[in-house]
C-alpha cells in the first residue's frame, strides 16, 4: 500500500520541512503533507497557553511584523494569512487545525478565500527565515 499522506510540523515558525527534503519528497512521490501545529501552537494567533518542549524554539517575533503587514493589507487576520501561506505551496499542504474558539475557526476558513501573491509568500518566508532566500 503506497504512502499517500505524511503528517509533519510545518508553519512559519517551523520551516524544517522546506529545507530538509520533506516537501520535495512529497512532491516527487505525490504524498500529501498534513501540517500539524500550522499556527505554531497558537503563537501565530493570540498566543499559546502552553508549549511542548519541541515548540519552545518557536520565534514568532521574527515574522509577526511581516505577517501583520500582509494581513492588514488584505483586511484579514494573521491566522488567515499564515494558513494561506501554507496552502500556496505546490505540495498542497493540508493544515490540521483544532480550536474551540469560533472566531479562530472563521479566521481559518478565510484562508481559502484568497491566494497570496508570490511576492507576499516570499516576503513571509524571508521574514520567518530571518535572512534572505538564496
Regions found by a protein language model. Name each.
Residues 1-134:
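Beta/alpha (TIM)-barrel catalytic core signal, keyed to glycine-rich beta->alpha loops juxtaposed to Asp/Glu
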Amino acid at each position: 500500500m503506497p504512502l499517500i499522506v505524511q503528517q509533519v510540523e510545518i508553519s512559519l515558525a517551523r520551516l524544517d520541512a522546506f529545507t530538509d527534503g520533506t516537501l520535495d519528497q512529497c512532491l516527487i512521490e505525490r504524498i500529501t503533507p498534513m501540517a500539524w501545529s500550522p499556527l505554531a501552537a497558537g503563537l501565530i494567533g493570540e498566543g499559546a497557553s502552553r508549549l511542548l518542549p519541541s515548540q519552545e524554539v518557536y520565534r514568532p517575533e521574527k515574522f509577526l511584523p511581516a505577517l501583520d503587514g500582509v494581513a492588514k493589507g488584505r483586511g484579514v487576520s494573521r491566522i488567515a494569512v499564515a494558513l494561506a501561506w501554507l496552502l500556496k505551496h505546490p505540495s498542497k499542504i493540508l493544515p490540521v487545525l483544532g480550536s474551540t474558539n469560533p472566531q479562530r475557526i472563521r479566521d481559518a476558513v478565510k484562508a481559502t478565500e484568497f491566494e497570496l501573491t508570490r511576492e507576499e509568500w516570499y516576503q513571509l518566508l524571508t521574514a520567518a527565515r530571518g535572512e534572505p532566500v538564496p
